[in-house]
Structure formats: structure tokens, C-alpha cells
């Protein structure tokens, strides 16, 4: 059992590494959205991501419903994060004006 747990821990570390990489792109995304006046929540993009995630999950033998639930949670968190960042940056810009 210890070897299985060690492999699960290894997978968890890899997931965190990938999440850190994704988070870096979220940081870039909100900055681009700020410059171009794009809302944090872009529903068509969310659906595009979910559809792709479900397809990939099915290809890999992972329950698509599980992956969709995880991604919706993650995307929802990132949208809230972007909304706060955008609001804070707009407020800071308005104070300077």
C-alpha cells in the first residue's frame, strides 16, 4: 500500500505543478482582459474548455462528470480571482485620474 500511496503523492505533486503553470496563464489573462476591456467571465470560453475536458477525460478513461465538476470549480475560482483583480486595477486607475 505504501508504494501506491507514494505514487498518488507523486501524481498530486504533478497536478500542483500543472496548476501553478495554469495559474501563471490566468495572471496573464486578467492583465490582457484589463487592457482590452474583456469581462472576467466569458461563458462561451468556459463551455469550450468544459467540452474539451470532457472529451479528453473520456479518451483517457476518467469519468467525464468528475472532470467537469473539478474544472467548473477551478474555472469558477479563477473567474472570481480575475474579477477581483480587474476591479482592483480599475479602482486604482480611477484614483490616479
Task: Tell me what each language-model feature is.
Residues 1-97:
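Domain-level signature for soluble enzymes in the chorismate/prephenate branch of the shikimate pathway
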Amino acid at each position: 500500500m505504501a508504494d501506491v500511496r507514494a505514487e498518488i503523492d507523486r501524481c498530486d505533486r504533478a497536478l500542483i505543478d500543472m496548476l501553478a503553470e495554469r495559474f501563471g496563464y490566468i495572471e496573464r489573462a486578467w492583465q490582457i482582459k484589463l487592457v482590452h476591456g474583456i469581462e472576467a467571465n466569458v461563458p462561451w470560453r468556459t463551455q469550450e474548455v468544459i467540452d474539451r475536458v470532457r472529451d479528453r477525460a473520456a479518451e483517457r478513461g476518467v469519468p467525464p462528470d468528475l472532470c467537469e465538476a473539478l474544472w467548473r470549480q477551478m474555472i469558477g475560482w479563477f473567474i472570481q480571482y480575475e474579477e477581483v483583480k480587474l476591479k482592483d486595477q480599475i479602482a486604482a486607475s480611477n484614483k490616479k485620474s
